[in-house]
């Protein structure tokens, strides 16, 4: 499993921060990175970990980022009570179906045998 999303201006804005916000200290940036990395691991674990290129596909990447950002933001703001949002769960369901389709196209089956 490989994480490749970074705490960029887009993710900072998702969390309500401006890119050069004075309120962004090293601790906040580290929490952002941890939340985003954990969200990626969660999403990939929920969908499938075998095909890392799947998540970088131009048709998949926007939904993948949206799911990771939604979960990462939730965990950033509510670390002790965070659960996945309904939106993130719906996106994961869509991505799981797309992942299965790509595995069938690639291997002829979704099974790992």
Each language-model region and where it sits:
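Divalent metal-cofactor coordination and adjacent catalytic microenvironments
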Residues: 1-113
């Amino acid at each position: 499993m490989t994480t490749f999303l970074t705490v960029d201006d887009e993710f900072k804005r998702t969390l309500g921060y401006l890119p050069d916000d004075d309120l962004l200290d090293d601790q906040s940036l580290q929490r952002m990175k941890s939340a985003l990395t954990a969200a990626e691991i969660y999403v990939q674990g929920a969908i499938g970990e075998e095909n890392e290129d799947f998540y970088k596909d131009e048709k998949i990447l926007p939904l993948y980022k949206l799911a990771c950002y939604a979960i990462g933001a939730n965990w950033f703001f509510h670390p002790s009570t965070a659960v996945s949002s309904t939106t993130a769960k719906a996106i994961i369901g869509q991505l799981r179906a797309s992942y299965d389709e790509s595995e069938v196209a690639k291997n002829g089956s979704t099974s790992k045998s």
